[in-house]
C-alpha cells in the first residue's frame, strides 16, 4: 500500500502538521490521517474500547474541510 499526500492544516507549524493522505488500495477507498494522539482520559472513556491495532487521533476541522472541498472539486 502507498500513501499520497492530500493536504495539511494550513495553520500548523512546518513539520508538525495534521495531514491527510489517500491510499492506493484497490478493494476500497481509504485514507490515512496524521494527527495529535488523544490521551485525554475523558475523551478515551467517551470513545470506549479501542483495539490495540488502532489509535484515536484528533485533527482540525480545517483538514476535513480541505478534504471535502477537494473531493467535491474532483482534485483528489
Language model region names:
Residues 1-17:
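Short, charged/polar N-terminal "headpieces" of proteins
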